[in-house]
C-alpha cells in the first residue's frame, strides 16, 4: 500500500528530472514492479520513513515494466532495486554483498533504512563516491 503514497516516476524523462533537478537532497529511487512482493515490502518501509527523511532525501518509485529505459544501464534484473543519487551523481554503498551499485534486498527495519539513507547522504555531501553501510548485509547476498 505504501507505493500508492510515494511519488511515481512514469517515464525516463521523469526519472532524469528527479535525479538532475534535486540540488540539496539525496534522491532515493526504488526500481521494480509495483506488484512484486519485495517491492511492496520495501515501499512500506520507504513510505513509513519518508516524513522522517524529508529534509535530506527525496524518495521515488519507478515501475521497471512501465519505464524499461534504465533496465540495461543500471542492470535492473532483480525484482527490487534501490539506488541513490546526489546532485546528478550515482552514489554507491558497500553493503557487504559484493554489489556496491545498488541495494537489491529488502531492509525490514525502519531505523536501519533511515541510517543507510543518512550515511549515503553524509558521504555524498563530502564528495565520497562510495560509502560503507552502517550495517553488514553479507547474509542477504543474492546469487
Swiss-Prot record:
Its main location: nucleus. SMART domains: DIM1 (SM01410). Keywords: Cell cycle, Cell division, Mitosis, mRNA processing, mRNA splicing, Nucleus. It is found in: Nucleus. One of its GO terms (cellular component) is spliceosomal complex. The keyword Amino-acid biosynthesis does not apply. Signal peptide: none annotated. Transmembrane segments: none annotated. GO terms for biological process: cell division; mRNA splicing, via spliceosome. InterPro entries: Dim1, Thioredoxin-like_sf. Component of the 25S [U4/U6.U5] tri-snRNP. Belongs to the DIM1 family. Essential role in pre-mRNA splicing. Also essential for entry into mitosis (G2/M progression) as well as for chromosome segregation during mitosis. This is Spliceosomal protein DIB1.
Amino acid at each position: 500500500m505504501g507505493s500508492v503514497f510515494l511519488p511515481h516516476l512514469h517515464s525516463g524523462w521523469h526519472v532524469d528530472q528527479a535525479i538532475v533537478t534535486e540540488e540539496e537532497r539525496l534522491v532515493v529511487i526504488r526500481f521494480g514492479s509495483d506488484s512484486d512482493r519485495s517491492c511492496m515490502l520495501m515501499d512500506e518501509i520507504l513510505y513509513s520513513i519518508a516524513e522522517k527523511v524529508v529534509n535530506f532525501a527525496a524518495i521515488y518509485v519507478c515501475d521497471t515494466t512501465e519505464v524499461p529505459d534504465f533496465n540495461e544501464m543500471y542492470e535492473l534484473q532483480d525484482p527490487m532495486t534501490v539506488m541513490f543519487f546526489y546532485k546528478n551523481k550515482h552514489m554507491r554503498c558497500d553493503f557487504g554483498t559484493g554489489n556496491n551499485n545498488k541495494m537489491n534486498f529488502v531492509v525490514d527495519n525502519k531505523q536501519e533504512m533511515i541510517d543507510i539513507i543518512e550515511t549515503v547522504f553524509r558521504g555524498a555531501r563530502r564528495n565520497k563516491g562510495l560509502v560503507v553501510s552502517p550495517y553488514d548485509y553479507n547474509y542477504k547476498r543474492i546469487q
